[in-house]
Structures are given as structure tokens and as C-alpha cells.
Amino acid sequence: MILLISDLHLQEERPDITRAFLDLLDGRARHAKALYILGDFFEAWIGDDAMTPFQQSICQAVRQLSDSGTAVYLMHGNRDFLIGEGFCKAAGCTLLADPSVISLGGEQVLLMHGDTLCTRDIGYMKMRRYLRNPLSLWILRHLPLATRQKLARKLRSESRAQTRMKATEIVDVTPEEVPAVMAAHGVKTLVHGHTHRPAIHKLVVNGEPARRIVLGDWDRRGWTLQVDAQGFQLEPFEFS
């Protein structure tokens, strides 16, 4: 069994989500061969050198899962792209490139966070290119802690405001981008998060049936994609 999740946006202000995640680690994830976290694991991340006690506790919990024998893979999201090898080493997880193709359920599957599929959101894509530039990343990681904290708050506030103002289709994936990316990677299944619109979409890639599986965000409930002998099962669950 393989589990895939994304968009938990873990933060101290949402202890219900934290409890649900820790319950998953102590439960189903212990029986999984691997757990994939496809971005926005944390609501914000300003550097491995600035972990709060809360973030350290999550790191330790992931480490316990890894030590129990479940492989853990972590992909950057738009909220936590400053997570580095320091955190991953401490947590016992592997940083996964976005995009990545893995063998899953007997086929090659493309994994992405999903933000790069939203090409109609021109403002966001421009900001993303700037922030992910290696020079920008180096500068961000070396800014004083107080400056990074202030910048993170500003970016989150602006992101929320802009998302509310933008049309739904702009902040969702660009329909023609999806089959193009899938064809470029030679896959018939794509799994991603980011849009907070959980669903399994049928489409055609290179004249053949294909599917796009969108993971759900953890807010009013949690979501997992379980891959086992029965196939790909996208399921919500209520917080206890």
C-alpha cells in the first residue's frame, strides 16, 4: 500500500489538522510501504534554521514513521518551498523533485504539486519564477529571521487576497496544459494537489484514455489517495 497526501498546511492554529495527521502516522501510514506528501505540508516555512517547536515536533513524528520502515517522500509546495535537506535529514524523508515520475500501481505516474499547471494565473507564475530562482532562494535563506517572518506574512496575506479576487478558472489548472505535460512525461496518470479541488478527471492523452487525480486539502476534512491491489482510491475522512 502507498499513501499520497498534500496541502495539509500544518500550523499551530489548526490543532485538529495536526491531530489528524499524527493519527494517520500512527495508523494507516505504519502499514504503508511509502507516504508521499506532495507539497504545502506546512502553511509556511522560512528556513530549516528557523524551525519552531511545533515544526520540530512534526519533524520528529515523521522521523518516527520513517524509522518504523515507511519511506517518506516530500515535495515542495508554494507555501513551503524553502524546506531543505536539513529538515529532510532530521525527518528521515527524501526531498522529491517537482515534477517526478514514479512506478505506482503497476504504471508510471507523474507526481506534481500542481501550481505549475495553473498557467493562466500569470501574476502567480511570474512571482514563482522569481522566488524559485537559485539566486533568490539563496538570498531568502540568508535574510535575517525577522525579515523572513515579515516577508512570509506579507506573501500569505497577498496570496489569500489575490485568490479571492481571481476567477475560479484562473486559479485552477489550464485544461490544455495537463495533457501536454502528461504527454511530455509519457504517462497516463497524473497526481497533484494545490488547487484544493479533489476529484478524478478522465481525459485523453495522445489518443489514449488517461486520468488526472487531484488530492484534497486538509481543512474541514482530510484526504488520502491510497494505492493498493484494488487500485487508486481517493477518499476523504473526518477529523476525530
UniProtKB/Swiss-Prot annotation:
UniProt enzyme class: hydrolase
Pathway terms, separated by semicolons: Glycolipid biosynthesis; lipid IV(A) biosynthesis; lipid IV(A) from (3R)-3-hydroxytetradecanoyl-[acyl-carrier-protein] and UDP-N-acetyl-alpha-D-glucosamine: step 4/6
Primary site of residence: membrane
InterPro entries: Calcineurin-like_PHP_ApaH, LpxH-like, Metallo-depent_PP-like, UDP-diacylglucosamine_Hdrlase
Cofactor(s) annotated in UniProt: Mn(2+)
GO term, biological process aspect, one: lipid A biosynthetic process
Binding of substrate, residues: N78, R79, D121, S159, T163, K166, H194
Gene Ontology CC terms: cytoplasm; extrinsic component of plasma membrane
Cellular compartment(s): Cell inner membrane
KW DNA repair (keyword) present: no
EC number of the protein: 3.6.1.54
NCBIfam families found in the cross-reference section: lipid_A_lpxH, PRK05340.1
Protein name: UDP-2,3-diacylglucosamine hydrolase
Organism ancestry: Bacteria, Pseudomonadati, Pseudomonadota, Gammaproteobacteria, Pseudomonadales
Name of the gene this protein is made from: lpxH
